[in-house]
Every structure is written in structure tokens, then in C-alpha cells.
């Protein structure tokens, strides 16, 4: 039977998975989809719009974060933190600044995790980076999130080594509805959200509009944020088969960053919220890490849903620009941040006096230090066309193509001379408003095509597919107009999976049992930043593809009110290449170092389980035990960027070293309770009243500090500093009540780090691989927030 797209609108305003209690991150194999048909929607139906895979039948390891769970965590300062509590996922703030966050899955960093928005890749093609601060509006605009660990469900995401995260934004509901909410933290960080859905309009139109405004400070010193976020979703239904979906999302923002790691001694002296990135300039707080950015993002999707043939076509464009304050020092000068007063903050008065005192023959002040605005931006555009044809009742053929265009630019502009008349930088004078250093960018053309077959019966779900990738990369000098030659590469991936239902749930039997396995191989193209790493127009020597091999197997069981999944995985990462500039100056040849031959092996076991203890109480638990280690001693080469001549060669000793930046042991649990109560405000309006509570516990252990492989040039170099394990407890309470006909009120309060644990969140290894030389960021102390929502139907 053909689906009407307005059913999708209804689905997108209904919980994905609900089995009592507050919203959950359901473990794979949950049977709760069949528990309450009137309040659920299958993931298969949602995937019509955004490639959500069905937890019930897929041979992949999936976790879906539902709208209820997102509502509980909307006060989190960083979007990725809503993904905590999933085994193998380490999602935290990077430095404590609002919006600055990092995501690791199964030991792989952000550039090896695919991020998709409504089924469309949104990462940069230069390095695979994902700057979450550019997407601050996502926390309010998101309807649901699916985390696909391992190779992922998408055939077009070639960077999914650790996994894939697919984010679904809100669309119009079936009927007119609105929401107003406001929340604030103990530091005064306040967010206001307005959301309105038109419901189904005449002639097949529907729209949803959301606006949010966030301002205030976090627990870190001088961490102001000011951002206005928006989402607009418009759909048009053409009959029962065709639908157009337009989405616009953006978040112009300004926020102060803490981007200088701290030592243990500094944290003990000044506290974990200490930042040495600011001081008083002309009597006002001045941050040297202020960031400003705006990336408006637009998509247009065409959906055809037929009995035998269905397709999804998308076009998208993003035009990003912004910048961030940074420091610059003359050749003989020390750094700005080294000028500290008695409180540990930047002494701008001393810096200005030093700048003014240094005179040339004409009496002009020659600055030793200055502030610049590091400006950057890009144009990102692309198109995806995919379709599937049902050959028989059991066999389906899928195929598609994708094109991505990514063009970047960057330049540095003199922002503040700090009392001087000009800055003498490598022999050239620079005055206020001048551009300093190189101005360049990279252009990327990335294409891919895939074909996949699926075989589905009552017992079996099999799929196998292959994808071919092509990348073309060129660098351009925006000062001279010169361009480099094109660097070209090809890649290919093959992946498949199988799931077998040993026991299927029936109307008379709730129990279900299945086993699954998946595997894949990816000859992966390096990012453009590897091919074009230098500040000149040279192409990096001897670039070769990475070779990634992944495999996983597991078992799922489900019963009335509960479920469990256990899986084991292995990921072999071969021929990882790192290319980094040693110098980036406009007037001299840069040197680069390239490290090749790095191998690593990631393996682990994961468990998730949940159980409804009563009608009002639900518990879930998870655990992960992993081993991620290097398996090779790579080769480092330093060479001249222009001539390509080798300057020196050296060995890089990473064999048997633990991978850093994420815990290799995780475990935790969560209790969720919902208590129906009588109406407290008005008689006859309390039928939907309830009080809910959620308490979570997350433990992280066996975590090593991050480190650069280039620092391991001695065979005696050992593991990075092992961070202390830590336990975090969070709690949320809330009250839902009907305050008037069609008006629901929700009052909530959240406390994170309930017992005020003192812990290290992330950091960089030091020379001695110990706490004394370690530099990093300590996690936030106990923090609370309160809020109020009004929903109108």
C-alpha cells in the first residue's frame, strides 16, 4: 500500500520507540516497537526520508536516540553529549567552551566517523572534520539520531570506519502545533525556543519553523556565547507517490573558546574552569579565542514511494564564512599567552607597554605582538540520486550516484596591533586591516556510485554491495591566482551483512531471537588535506589509499518488556598516512613531514540490555571492553615542499602502543520512571499529568592521552599517559500537566555530574608520559539547569 507523505509528517512528531518511562536510547533488537502500536512508528518508514535502518531486521549494530531522550538532554551545552551512554561512543566537550565538542566511536576519531543530516553527508572534505560549534541549532532542530557503529548502512559514506551518525531534523506534524520553551543554567546560560508546525494544509503543503536564541556563559572563564538558530522545513505532496522536502538550517554564532590545554598544576591553582585565553584589555574582558561563524545549509529532496520502485534524490548547498581571533608574534617575540599577571590571565597592559616602547627611526611603534582574525569559509554543494527496484517478493536491487563539490578559502587579517603602529613580521610591515601570511584554498570534486542487492525472507536478511569513489583535488593561491596540478585518486569498498531470525515474535509470542554478522573492506581515499598539505602548490609525494577491513557478529534477544544484544567486532586499519606542515609562511618554502605505514587493530565486545521492571519503572545497562593498539612502526619523511627532495628519514615507533583519546572500557546504567498523578491545577485536566525522573551512571576507564605519532621517534618510547578512570552520575526530574485545553506544560530540572567528580576529559601526552607533563581539559563540575515548555495542539 502506498504511503502518503503526511503520514511521514505525523510519524516525525511521534516517538520512534516508546516502551514506558521517559525516552530511551533503545538497544538493537528491542521489541518495544510492537508494544504500543498507537504511539510508535517503525524505523523502516522513517528511512523513506533519511536512511534510518530498522533495528529489528538489520545486520548492523544500531542505537536510536528518541525524541524523549533528546528532550531530557536539550540543556547540554554540546550537541554530541546526547550520545553518551552508548557502548563504544565517547562524546564529550573538547575544552568546556559552548559548542566545542569531539566524538569518537570504537576508538576512531571524528575524521573516521561519518556524519549525515537527513541522509546527506555534511562533513568537510579537506580533513573530515566536523566543527559542532557551526551547528549549534541542531540540538533544537533534531527529531531523532541513529548511531550505526562499524561500517554503517550508507553506501556513500566512505569515512565510516568507526561508525555513522545520521541526524533527522524536525518536519511538520499532521495537525497544527506549537512549542515555547525557556531554560537556564546556574551560570546564566539561557536558551529560548519557538517552534510552530502548520500541520497539513490545502493542496498538499506543510511547514515547520523553529527559532532559538542562546546567550550567556558556561563554567569556563570568559566563555560567552551568543547564537541565533533557525530551522525551516517545507514539504509538498504530489499525489500519493511524490513529495518534495525543503530544509533550511543555520546558526550564526559568536562564542569565546578555551583552546589552550592546562597542566595539573594550573588546574589545582586556579580551578578546572580556568582559562588562560583571556585578560583585561582597556578595562574589559578580552578573549584571544573568540570565534564567529555562519553556515547556512539548504537541502531539497525528492521522494518517490512506489510499490516496486522507489527513489530518493537530493541536492544541497552550504555557504560558510567566519573566523576566529588568533595571536601573532614578531620573529624575536615570545607569545602573548606567556604574558600572565598574578591571576594567571593575559597581562595586556604589559604587552601594550612593550609594543609602544619599541620605536623605529621615525618614532613609530614596532609591535612585537598583535591580534589577527583568522578568516575562513567554504562552498559545499552536491547531489545524490538513489533508487531501489523490487525484482521479486524477496529480492531488491539498489543503486545510486553522488557528487560533492567543496571549495575552501582562508586568510589572516590584522585585527588589533595592541598599541603599536605596525608589526614587523619576517621583514615586512603589517598595519591594521592588512592581510598577513598566505591566502589560499582547496577545491575538491568527489564522486561515487554504488550498487547493492538485498534478499529478505521471513527468516533471512542478506545484503551485499560495492561502491567506487573518485576524488580530484587542487590548491589555489588567492594572492597570485596560481593553481596546482590536479591530484587524483580512486577508491573502492565492498560490504555486506546477514541476519537470521531463529525465533520471531508473533501476536501470541513476544519472544524473539536472532543472530547477525557484517563485514566490509574499504580501499579508502585520503582526504584533500593529505594530497595538498603544503602552503605552496606542491602535491604530497607517494600518497596511497588506506586499507580498512571490518567485521562484526552478534546476537539479539527480545521478550515482553525487555531485550539484550551482545556483539563482538574487529577493525584492521592499514597504511594510515599523516601529513603535517612544519611551517606555513607566505614568503618561504615550507617543509612537511609525512608519516606512512601506520597500522592499528581495534577489537572489542559490547553489550546493551533493557527491562521494564514495572509499568512505571525501566532500567537499561551497557558495557564495552576493547583493545585498540598500533601494529606497526611507521616511516617518517621530512622533505622540501617545492623540490620534493628528501631532507631526512626516520622511524616512527607506534607498534603495540594503545590508541589514545577515548576510553577502552565503558559501563553504565540508567533508571527511568514515570508516575501518573492526579491533576494539580484544574479538575478534569489532569488525566495526562505525570512526574518523571531519570538517573544515569556512566563509567570510563583504560583511557590514554592523545599523542602525535611523530613524537614517537625512539624505540624506547612507551604508551601515552593513562588517564584516571572516572564515574559520572546525571539526574533529571520533570512534571507534565495539562494547564488548559490543548496546552501541555512541562517543568524540568537537570543536574550533571551529580557527585561533583574531579576527572580529566581529554588531553595531550607530554614528554615524560605522566601527569606532570600532560596537558588537557578537566571535566565540568556539578552543574544544574531548569526549564519550562509549553506545547500547543
Annotate each language-model stretch with its function.
Residues 6, 249-251, 499, 513, ...:
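Conserved C-terminal beta-signal and adjacent last beta-strands/turns
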Residues 27-30, 40-74, 102:
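N-terminal periplasmic "start-of-domain" segments of outer-membrane beta-barrel proteins
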Residues 80-121, 143:
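Extracytoplasmic beta-strand/coil segments of soluble accessory domains associated
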Residues 121-149, 168, 266-268, 273:
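Short acidic/polar hinge/loop motifs at secondary-structure boundaries
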Residues 136-181:
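A beta-strand signature from Gram-negative outer-membrane beta-barrel systems
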Residues 177, 184-215, 220-258, 293, ...:
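Transmembrane beta-barrel wall of Gram-negative outer-membrane proteins
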Residues 260-265, 470-475, 486, 500-552, ...:
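Surface-exposed extracellular loop regions of Gram-negative outer-membrane beta-barrel proteins
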Residues 393, 456-461, 471, 568-572, ...:
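Gram-negative outer-membrane beta-barrel transporters
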Amino acid at each position: 500500500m502506498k504511503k502518503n507523505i503526511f503520514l511521514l509528517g505525523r510519524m516525525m512528531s511521534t516517538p520512534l520507540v516508546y516502551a514506558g518511562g521517559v525516552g530511551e536510547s533503545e538497544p538493537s533488537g528491542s521489541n518495544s516497537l510492537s508494544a504500543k502500536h498507537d504511539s510508535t512508528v517503525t524505523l523502516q518508514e522513517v528511512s523513506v526520508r533519511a536512511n534510518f535502518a530498522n533495528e529489528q531486521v538489520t545486520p548492523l549494530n544500531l542505537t536510536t536516540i528518541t525524541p524523549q531522550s533528546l528532550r531530557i538532554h536539550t540543556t547540554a551545552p554540546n550537541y554530541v553529549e546526547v550520545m553518551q551512554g552508548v557502548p563504544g561512543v565517547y562524546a564529550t566537550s573538547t575544552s568546556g567552551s559552548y559548542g566545542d565538542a569531539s566524538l569518537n566511536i570504537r576508538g576512531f576519531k571524528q575524521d573516521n566517523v561519518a556524519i549525515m543530516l537527513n541522509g546527506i553527508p555534511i562533513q568537510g572534505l579537506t580533513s573530515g572534520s566536523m566543527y559542532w560549534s557551526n551547528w549549534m541549532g541542531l540540538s533544537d532542530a533534531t527529531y531523532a539520531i541513529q548511531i550505526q557503529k562499524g561500517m554503517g548502512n550508507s553506501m556513500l559514506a566512505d569515512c565510516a570506519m568507526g561508525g555513522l551518525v545520521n541526524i533527522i531534523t524536525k518536519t511538520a506534524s499532521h495537525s497544527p502545533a506549537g512549542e515555547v520553551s525557556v531554560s537556564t543554567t546556574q551560570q546564566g546560560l539561557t536558551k529560548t525556543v519557538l517552534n510552530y508546525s502548520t500541520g497539513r494544509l490545502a493542496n498538499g503543503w506543510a511547514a515547520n519553523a523553529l527559532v532559538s536564541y542562546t546567550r550567556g556563559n558556561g563554567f569556563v572563564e570568559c566563555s560567552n556565547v551568543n547564537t541565533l538558530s533557525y530551522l525551516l522545513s517545507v514539504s509538498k505532496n504530489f499525489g500519493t507517490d511524490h513529495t518534495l522536502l525543503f530544509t533550511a538550517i543555520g546558526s550564526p554564532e559568536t562564542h569565546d573558546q578555551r583552546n589552550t590545554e592546562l597542566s595539573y598544576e594550573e588546574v589545582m591553582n586556579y580551578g578546572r574552569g580556568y582559562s588562560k585565553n583571556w585578560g583585561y584589555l582597556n578595562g574589559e574582558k578580552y578573549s584571544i579565542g573568540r570565534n564567529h561563524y555562519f553556515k547556512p545549509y539548504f537541502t531539497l529532496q525528492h521522494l518517490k514511494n512506489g510499490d516496486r520502485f522507489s527513489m530518493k534524490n537530493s541536492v544541497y548547498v552550504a555557504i560558510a564564512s567566519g573566523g576566529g581571533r588568533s595571536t601573532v608574534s614578531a620573529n624575536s617575540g615570545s607569545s602573548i599567552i606567556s604574558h600572565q599577571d598574578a591571576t594567571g590571565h593575559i597581562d595586556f597592559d604589559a604587552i601594550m607597554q612593550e609594543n609602544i616602547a619599541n620605536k623605529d627611526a621615525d618614532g613609530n611603534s614596532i609591535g612585537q605582538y598583535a591580534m589577527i582574525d583568522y578568516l575562513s569559509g567554504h562552498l559545499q554543494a552536491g547531489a545524490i540520486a538513489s533508487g531501489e527496484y523490487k525484482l521479486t517478493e524477496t529480492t531488491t536491487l539498489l543503486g545510486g550516484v553522488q557528487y560533492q563539490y567543496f571549495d575552501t578559502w582562508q586568510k589572516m587579517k590584522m585585527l588589533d596591533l595592541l598599541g603599536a603602529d605596525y608589526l614587523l613580521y619576517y621583514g615586512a610591515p603589517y598595519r591594521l586591516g592588512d592581510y598577513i601570511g598566505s591566502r589560499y584554498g582547496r577545491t575538491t570534486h568527489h564522486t561515487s556510485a554504488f550498487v547493492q542487492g538485498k534478499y529478505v525472507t521471513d527468516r533471512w536478511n542478506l545484503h551485499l554491495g560495492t561502491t567506487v569513489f573518485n576524488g580530484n583535488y587542487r590548491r589555489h593561491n588567492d594572492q597570485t591566482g596560481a593553481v596546482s596540478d590536479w591530484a587524483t585518486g580512486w577508491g573502492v569498498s565492498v560490504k555486506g551483512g546477514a541476519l537470521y531470525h531463529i525465533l520471531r515474535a508473533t501476536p501470541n509470542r513476544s519472544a524473539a531471537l536472532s543472530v547477525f554478522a557484517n563485514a566490509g573492506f574499504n580501499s579508502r581515499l585520503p582526504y584533500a588535506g593529505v594530497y595538498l598539505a603544503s602552503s605552496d602548490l606542491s602535491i604530497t609525494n607517494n600518497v596511497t589509499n588506506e586499507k580498512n577491513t571490518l567485521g562484526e557478529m552478534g546476537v539479539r534477544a527480545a521478550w515482553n518488556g525487555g531485550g539484550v544484544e551482545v556483539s563482538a567486532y574487529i577493525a584492521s586499519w592499514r597504511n594510515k598516512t599523516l601529513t603535517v606542515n612544519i611551517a606555513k609562511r607566505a614568503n618561504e618554502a615550507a617543509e612537511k613531514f609525512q608519516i606512512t605505514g601506520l597500522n592499528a587493530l581495534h577489537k572489542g565486545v559490547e553489550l546493551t540490555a533493557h527491562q521494564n521492571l514495572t509499568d512505571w519503572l525501566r532500567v537499561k545497562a551497557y558495557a564495552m571492553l576493547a583493545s585498540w593498539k598500533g601494529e606497526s612502526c611507521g616511516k617518517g619523511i621530512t622533505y622540501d615542499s617545492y623540490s620534493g627532495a628528501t631532507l631526512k628519514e626516520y622511524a616512527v615507533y607506534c607498534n603495540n602502543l594503545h590508541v589514545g583519546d577515548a576510553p577502552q572500557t565503558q559501563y553504565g546504567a540508567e533508571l527511568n520512571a514515570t508516575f501518573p498523578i492526579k491533576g494539580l491545577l484544574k479538575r478534569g485536566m489532569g488525566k495526562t499529568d505525570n512526574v518523571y525522573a531519570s538517573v544515569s551512571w556512566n563509567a570510563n576507564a583504560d583511557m590514554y592521552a592523545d599523542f602525535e605519532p611523530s613524537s614517537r621517534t625512539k624505540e624506547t618510547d612507551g604508551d601515552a599517559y593513562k588517564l584516571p578512570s572516572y564515574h559520572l552520575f546525571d539526574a533529571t526530574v520533570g512534571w507534565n500537566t495539562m494547564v488548559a485545553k490543548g496546552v501541555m506544560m512541562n517543568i524540568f530540572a537537570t543536574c550533571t555530574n551529580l557527585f561533583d567528580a574531579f576527572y580529566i576529559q581529554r588531553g595531550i601526552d607530554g614528554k615524560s608520559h605522566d601527569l606532570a607533563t600532560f596537558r588537557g581539559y578537566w571535566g565540568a563540575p556539578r552543574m544544574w539547569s531548569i526549564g519550562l515548555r509549553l506545547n500547543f495542539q
